[in-house]
């Protein structure tokens, strides 16, 4: 949920950020169609009787997680009553301009369209939910212009799990190049 939370924070307080790295995220306003994969995820999150966080994270990865890592994703939630936040987040993603969060995301985009500090997109090649989600950032954010943006080959949605060391190296290089 870094896009919906973090990018709105960058937009609200841009001077606090020397540079930004995003991966497999978005800041939708509901003006374009949501992907079928996202709509299915959104529906599932609201209707499934059981919400197995560790299993869901595992399924969104290309490489299988160990049982210990999957259990760590479940650990903050002793039972389903603790998962209200995790369940509601997908429903807060605007899929039409009338959605309550649409105007806040539109306002954030107006700020990001002026953000000229270094901005790196590192999206994976195997995430059906955010595939192509880097395009609006590459087109609209001035700080994203004129630099190479890596495609993280072999990564699913959770890059930190599938390609953690490779992603860390890209971020390290980006920081070094823009320091």
Name each model-derived stretch.
Residues 7, 11, 16-53:
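Flexible "cap/lid" loop of the alpha/beta hydrolase fold
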Residues 8, 55, 72, 88, ...:
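Alpha-helical elements of Rossmann-like donor-binding domains used by nucleotide-donor carbohydrate transfer enzymes
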Residues 119-155:
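Conserved loop-alpha-helix segment in the C-terminal half of the alpha/beta-hydrolase fold
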Residues 73, 86, 112, 121-124, ...:
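Generic structural signal for small/hydrophobic residues in well-ordered secondary structure
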Residues 30-33, 50-106, 110-112:
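Conserved alpha/beta-hydrolase catalytic His-Asp/Glu region
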Residues 2, 6:
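Gly/Ala-rich beta-loop-alpha elbow adjacent to hydrolase catalytic centers
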Residues 145-179:
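Catalytic active-site module of serine/aspartate enzymes centered on a nucleophile-bearing elbow/loop
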Residues 31-36, 41, 84-87, 132-135, ...:
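Short aromatic-enriched loop/helix-cap "lid" or pocket-rim segments at secondary-structure transitions
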């Amino acid at each position: 949920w870094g896009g919906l939370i973090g990018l709105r924070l960058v937009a609200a307080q841009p001077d606090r950020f020397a540079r930004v790295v995003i991966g497999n995220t978005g800041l939708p306003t509901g003006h374009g169609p949501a992907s079928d994969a996202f709509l299915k995820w959104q529906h599932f999150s609201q209707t499934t009787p059981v919400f197995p966080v560790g299993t869901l994270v595992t399924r969104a990865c290309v490489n299988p997680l160990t049982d210990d890592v999957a259990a760590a994703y479940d650990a903050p939630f002793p039972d389903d009553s603790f998962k209200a936040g995790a369940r509601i987040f997908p429903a807060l993603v605007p899929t039409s301009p009338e959605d309550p969060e649409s105007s806040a995301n539109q306002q954030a985009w107006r700020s990001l369209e002026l953000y000229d500090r270094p901005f790196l997109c590192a999206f994976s090649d195997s995430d059906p939910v955010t595939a192509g989600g880097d395009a609006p950032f590459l087109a609209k954010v001035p700080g994203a212009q004129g630099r190479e943006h890596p495609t993280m080959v072999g990564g699913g949605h959770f890059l930190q799990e599938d390609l953690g060391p490779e992603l860390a190296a890209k971020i390290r290089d980006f920081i070094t190049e823009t320091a």
